[in-house]
From Swiss-Prot:
Subcellular location: Cytoplasm, Cytoskeleton; Endosome; Synapse
Assembly behavior: Homodimer. Interacts with microtubules via its N-terminus.
SUPFAM superfamilies the UniProt entry points to: Hook domain (SSF116907)
Domain notes: The coiled coil domain mediates homodimerization.
Protein name: Protein hook
Keyword annotations from UniProtKB, A to Z: Coiled coil, Cytoplasm, Cytoskeleton, Developmental protein, Endocytosis, Endosome, Microtubule, Synapse
Gene name in the database record: hook
GO biological process, one term: cytoplasmic microtubule organization
GO CC annotations on file: centrosome; endosome; microtubule; synapse
Pfam families: HOOK, HOOK_N
PANTHER family per the UniProt record, alphabetical: HOOK PROTEINS, PROTEIN HOOK
């Protein structure tokens, strides 16, 4: 809502406050219930807005109930529109109807402004309009201007309405002459009212001009007195204009302006007197017209009474039609009631039959109760037996697994036993050879003692330490073989699990193909349980396989660590062996310089020891390591190939000709061993 519209509302509210009303009418909330507006309309035109109509407006218990406000405002607006159309013969088709809901709920100022405009039009066009116009003229100039603007908007939107048909036309056949006179008088009254309105507007404009001229005259008189008091006057450019004296140029100009203003004042006063005379003439004409209007109002009152009688007859006719419609509905209901009675009889007969059937069913239920208990017992026994069978099968699987583990351990122990027996035989042979060689080595004992005494203490300690480590590595080779055996067992277990998984997958695929080939609705109940069991077995096997793979990877890591340690030890032994040979050659040279006989004996003993070391140590070590590496590489290659084959088959089966459920039941392809190792 813009500012000027709010100003118009507040000016209309100030005019409305001047009315003597019983209901509160000081603000928008008090006007929103419609009580004050109804009282004002009753005060303006009591013959149209009667006391009976005013009693229909609910004044008490309205409060904040917007529905009661809405009903009051509807009655007020409807009666106002009827007053404009019937009494004033004005059409408000171009005037936007106020939104009553927004007034009742939110007290919208814009909509209240439109409603107050309509009420103002009723006040200006009523029988006692002169008193209300004088009250408006007593208000402030701004309020008068806003009220005049509101009246101009209302005058611009209203139009002369054509003669309406209906009940009035039917009644006007009897009193056509009176209506024609009333229409002519009404038109004369409207023309005079329009002339009065225009003269009032001209009067207001002239009054405004008069006030403006008086203000300008007062200002000029003040300026003239100020100029007479002061001897010198300074112009706009700051130059002194000199004293205002008679006969001077400035005095003549001021005198001429004063004369012009006096002439204009005289013209305005003459025009005002002319307008006063015209207004008096129009007042006399208005009095004559009011007398004629009163006569016409009496005739219009008779017409309204006839209208009321016609409305009463209409209402009675409508009530009669409603009663006839109700009679027809009651007849239909009576027919429906008779039909319902017949249906109730049929239902009673059926209920009697149902009672007999229920009695028979109860007897049958008592008979079947005993058999039902036995069936439930058998079901429980079957469930217990199934649970026992599952437990026994799981125990059997565990025992088989333990048996396989024990067999593997037994084989490993047997192999260790065989290796120990071989070592024992070798040691016995070595002891026998040493016993035989002690006799031959007594002669060369002095040379060896001399050579050992000749060797430095650091090299002797290193050689002793290397010999001890060599023995420990030989002894630990048995543990390494045990680890290799464990790795072989784990690989075998992985192969067994993969074979079982392969058979399970083949069985699943065969069942899925069979279920697809036959009718799925008939075979679904038969193959559902088997597929679920096989899927559970498949998941268990995959978990076991993953565990075995993790064990095999850990064992392979251990084997690789041991291999690296062995290679490092062998390199250290080779380095120390080269140093040892250098030291021996130096010792030989020293001994040759001392005694050539001892040197020849030393050469023979050193060559025998070196040949024994070469024959004993590297050959069996390298052969065992090569065999273990070859077997582990072979098992890895077999596992990777088998897994790739299974994944390719699963990918082919999942991609071609399978239903959505069959694809969901298939297990996802597993990751490769290389990816698991990298993790």
């Amino acid at each position: 809502m813009s500012a000027p519209k709010n100003e118009m509302y507040y000016s209309l509210l100030e005019w409305f406050k001047t009315l003597n009303l019983n209901a509160p009418h000081a603000d928008a909330e008090s006007l929103a219930d419609g009580v004050a507006l109804a009282q004002a309309l009753n005060q303006f035109a009591p013959e149209s807005f009667t006391d009976a109509w005013l009693s229909k407006i609910k004044a008490s218990a309205v409060g904040s109930n917007w529905r009661l406000r809405m009903s009051n405002l509807k009655k007020v607006t409807q009666s106002v529109y009827d007053y404009y159309s019937d009494v004033l013969n004005y059409s408000l088709s171009d005037f936007s109807k106020p939104d009553l809901q927004s007034i009742a709920e939110k007290c919208d100022l814009g909509e209240l402004e439109r409603l107050l405009q309509l009420v103002l039009g009723c006040a200006v066009n009523c029988a006692e309009k002169q008193s209300y116009i004088t009250e408006i003229m007593c208000l402030e100039e701004e309020l008068q201007a806003n009220i005049m603007r509101a009246l101009q908007e209302l005058e611009a939107t209203r139009q002369a309405s054509s003669a309406e048909g209906g009940v009035v036309s039917s009644l006007s056949r009897s009193s056509r002459t009176g209506n024609l006179d009333s229409k002519a008088v009404q038109e004369d009254r409207d023309a005079l009212a329009q002339k009065c309105f225009e003269t009032e507007k001209k009067m207001l404009l002239l009054i405004d001009e008069k006030t403006n001229l008086q203000q300008e005259l007062h200002k000029l008189q003040q300026e003239f007195s100020r100029l007479e008091q002061h001897s010198t006057v300074i112009g706009d450019d700051g130059v002194s204009l000199g004293p205002v004296q008679t006969g001077s140029v400035r005095y003549n100009e001021l005198r001429r302006q004063l004369d012009l203003l006096k002439e204009e004042l005289l013209h305005s006063e003459g025009a005002r007197e002319d307008l006063k005379l015209k207004a008096q003439q129009q007042d006399t004409d208005l009095l004559h017209m009011q007398m004629r209007i009163e006569e016409l109002m009496k005739s219009s009152a008779e017409v309204t009474t006839l209208k009321d009688e016609v409305d009463v007859l209409r209402e009675s006719n409508d009530k009669l039609k409603i009663c006839e419609a109700q009679l027809d509905t009651y007849k239909k209901k009576l027919e429906d009631y008779n039909d319902l009675k017949k249906q109730v009889k049929i239902l009673e007969e059926r209920s009697a039959d149902y009672v007999q059937q229920n009695a028979q069913f109860e007897e049958d239920a008592k008979r079947y109760a005993n058999t039902k208990g036995q069936v439930e017992l058998f079901k429980k026994e079957i469930q217990d037996l199934h649970a026992k069978l599952d437990a026994e099968s799981s125990k059997n699987v565990k025992l088989e697994f333990d048996n396989k583990n024990l067999e593997g351990k037994n084989l490993a122990l047997q192999r260790a036993k065989d290796s120990l027996l071989k070592e024992r035989d070798n040691l016995r042979e070595a002891v026998d050879e040493l016993k035989c060689g002690q006799l031959s080595s007594n002669t060369a004992l002095t040379g060896t003692t001399v050579s050992r005494e000749m060797q430095p203490s650091a090299t002797v300690e290193k050689l002793q330490r290397l010999e001890a480590e060599n023995k420990a590595l030989r002894e630990g080779q048995g543990g390494q073989t045990a680890l290799a055996q464990l790795l072989d067992d784990a690989n075998k277990r992985c192969e067994n699990l993969r074979e079982q998984l392969k058979t399970a997958n083949e069985r699943i695929l065969s069942l899925s193909h069979a279920s697809q080939s036959d009718d799925p609705i008939l075979k679904e109940s038969e193959f559902g349980k088997q597929i679920k069991q096989l899927m559970e077995l498949n998941e268990q096997k995959t978990l076991q396989l993953e565990e075995a793979v993790t064990q095999s990877t850990s064992l392979q890591c251990k084997v690789t660590q041991l291999e690296t340690n062995l290679s490092a030890r062998e390199q250290e032994i080779l380095v120390y062996d080269a140093k040892y040979r250098k030291c021996v050659e130096k010792a030989k040279e020293v001994i040759k310089s001392i005694d050539p006989r001892i040197a020849s004996a030393l050469d023979a003993s050193v060559l025998e020891k070196s040949s024994d070391l070469v024959e004993e140590e590297p050959k069996p070590k390298m052969s065992v390591m090569e065999e273990q590496l070859m077997t582990s590489a072979f098992y890895r290659l077999g596992v990777n190939a088998q897994r790739d084959a299974i994944d390719s088959k699963l990918a082919i089966l999942m991609g071609s000709g399978q239903t959505f459920l069959a694809r969901q039941r298939q297990s996802a392809p597993r990751k490769s061993l290389s990816a698991m190792k990298s993790k």
